[in-house]
């Protein structure tokens, strides 16, 4: 469109704004320090569980250096959202088949944690990774 109309935003997302307001209120009620502590605990639990299976966790042993992300694999493999590593691809498919939300970034499996994740979620991911490893070893 010629002219200033090309900058029109269209309809405003009032429902999204109301939902965002309530979400921010909830996060503020929980408190950022509590969220950080919860996510940090989950991150350490996940990283330690995967490391115990000798999976290549980026960043190594858990500690304060970890963020809310746990990545598995070797950095630099393939494109932005793919991997050339057959093992990582196989584990990713196993997680997909069991409805674990994750992504592939630069050859790594990327697991992102937040306040809505639980210790049970982490235990399930670790159990699925162990199941994948044991199935692969038996083949």
What name fits each language-model region?
Residues 38, 61, 137-139:
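Short, flexible loop/turn segments with low-complexity composition
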Residues 1-48:
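Structural signature of PLP-dependent enzymes
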Residues 32, 40-44, 53-94, 98:
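Conserved PLP-binding catalytic core of the aspartate aminotransferase-like
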Residues 16, 62-64, 103-106:
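Short, flexible turn/loop "capping" segments at secondary-structure junctions
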Residues 26, 49, 53, 132:
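Short alpha-helical functional segments enriched in proximate histidine and acidic residues
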Residues 3-5, 66-70, 107-111:
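Short amphipathic alpha-helical segments
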Residues 80-139:
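PLP-dependent enzyme catalytic core of the Aspartate aminotransferase-like
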Residues 9-11, 60, 118:
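Generic structural "secondary-structure junction" signal
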């Amino acid at each position: 469109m010629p002219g200033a109309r090309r900058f029109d935003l269209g309809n405003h997302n009032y429902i999204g704004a109301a939902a965002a307001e309530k979400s921010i209120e909830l996060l503020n009620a929980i408190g950022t320090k509590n969220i950080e502590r919860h996510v940090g605990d989950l991150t350490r639990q996940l990283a330690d569980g995967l490391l115990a299976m000798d999976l290549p966790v980026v960043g190594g042993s858990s500690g304060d250096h970890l963020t809310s992300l746990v990545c598995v694999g070797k950095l630099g493999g393939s494109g932005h959202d793919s991997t050339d590593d057959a093992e990582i691809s196989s584990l990713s498919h196993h997680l997909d088949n069991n409805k674990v939300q994750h992504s592939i970034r630069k050859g790594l499996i990327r697991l992102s944690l937040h306040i809505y994740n639980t210790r049970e979620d982490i235990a399930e991911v670790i159990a699925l990774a162990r199941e994948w490893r044991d199935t692969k070893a038996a083949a």
